[in-house]
Swiss-Prot record:
This is ATP synthase gamma chain. Signal peptide: none annotated. It comes from Rickettsia peacockii (strain Rustic). One of its GO terms (biological process) is proton motive force-driven plasma membrane ATP synthesis. PANTHER family: ATP SYNTHASE GAMMA CHAIN, ATP SYNTHASE SUBUNIT GAMMA, MITOCHONDRIAL. It is a peripheral membrane protein. InterPro entries: ATP_synth_F1_ATPase_gsu, ATP_synth_F1_gsu, RPE2. One of its GO terms (cellular component) is plasma membrane. SUPFAM superfamilies: ATP synthase (F1-ATPase), gamma subunit. Produces ATP from ADP in the presence of a proton gradient across the membrane. The gamma chain is believed to be important in regulating ATPase activity and the flow of protons through the CF(0) complex.
Length: 323
């Protein structure tokens, strides 16, 4: 009888856990849908900044001032700034593992070359995974708020811009998971600065933003010339001729600010969508596993009860025969 009690207790416990995982699955599905909507709403802004950047890069970089050229040139013998985006909470499968693994591999490679490293970590899980081994490299750590927060985006941007303007870093690379669907997240390493001239700066691949890596040349990419770019917004494809005039000493700096801002915003939204997709999938799998375990435990309970009843019947029959 004690065995039956243990089985009933375990079944009750698994059912309780199943309710929690099911609720978390539904919450993550709802959050993911909202974030996908935010991504869609931000497409126009990201596309506009992308087109302006393409137009700017049609000019000769050496026509710019020394202060402006630093956004397009690598500063030798300075630190590599790595921005790592992970989750604040767990229970999201391998979401953080792929990012942390890639960051560790890149840090090891940079160390072997004798290069300097700075880390900006966003998300508690990434900080916990990297602080023991690379605490001396960590420049800043930001906790990830429960909802998409522009203040976080601005703080990270200010850190990047300050480091670049003060010539503290040679380049800036961001690590995040790009959202493909609820079951698939693509680990992405994206160079933000210095901005590479000969790249396709199109960022949009509806319904989810697809940002071509600045600094990572894509097959078939061609130099941008004639100060022209292509706009593909809401199914419409047309050529836009930018009448770009270089005026104002802060023009390039302001555009770079917008560009870095859009890159971070894009990465944060993609990372959040990927996190909720990974968590939804993980909780769905946990719910299904709980259901399978409950079925096995119920079967075991029924067999145990049947064995007890059979034993009691045999004892009753044996007793009646003895009488």
């Amino acid at each position: 009888m004690s065995n039956l009690k243990q089985l009933r207790t375990r079944i009750k416990s698994v059912k309780s856990t199943q309710k929690i995982t099911k609720a978390m699955q539904l919450v993550s599905a709802s959050k993911m849908a909202k974030i996908k909507s935010q991504i869609a709403n931000s497409n126009f802004y990201i596309e506009a900044v992308s087109k302006m950047m393409s137009a700017i890069l049609s000019i000769d970089i050496y026509e710019l001032s020394i202060e402006e050229q630093k956004f397009f040139n690598t500063v030798p013998n300075k630190a590599n700034l790595l921005i790592v985006m992970t989750s604040q909470r767990g229970l999201c499968g391998t979401f953080n593992y792929s990012i942390i693994k890639q960051v560790k591999n890149d840090i090891k490679e940079l160390e072997n070359k004798g290069e300097q490293i700075k880390l900006i970590i966003i998300g508690k899980k990434g900080y916990e995974a990297l602080k023991r081994q690379y605490v001396n490299y960590i420049d800043s750590y930001f906790e990830l708020p429960k909802i998409h927060d522009e203040n976080l985006m601005l703080q990270v941007k200010q850190k990047i811009m300050s480091a670049v303007e003060n010539l503290e870093v040679s380049n800036c690379v961001i690590y995040f998971n790009k959202f493909k669907n609820a079951m698939t997240q693509i680990m992405t390493r994206q160079q933000i600065l210095p901005v590479a001239k000969y790249q396709d700066h199109s960022m949009i691949d509806n319904p989810i933003v697809n940002l071509v890596g600045f600094g990572y040349k894509e097959r078939g990419a061609k130099p941008i010339n004639n100060r022209r770019a292509t706009s593909d917004i809401v199914g419409e494809s047309k050529s836009i001729d930018y009448n770009y005039e270089y005026e104002g000493e802060n023009l390039i700096s302001n555009l770079i600010n917008l560009y870095v801002n859009s890159q971070i915003n894009y990465a944060l939204l993609q990372s959040r969508a990927s996190e909720e997709g990974a968590r939804m999938t993980a909780m769905e799998n946990a719910t299904n596993n709980a259901n399978d375990l409950i079925s096995k435990l119920v079967l075991k309970l029924n067999r145990s009860r049947q064995a007890i009843i059979t034993t009691e019947l045999i004892e009753i029959i044996a007793g009646s025969e003895a009488v």
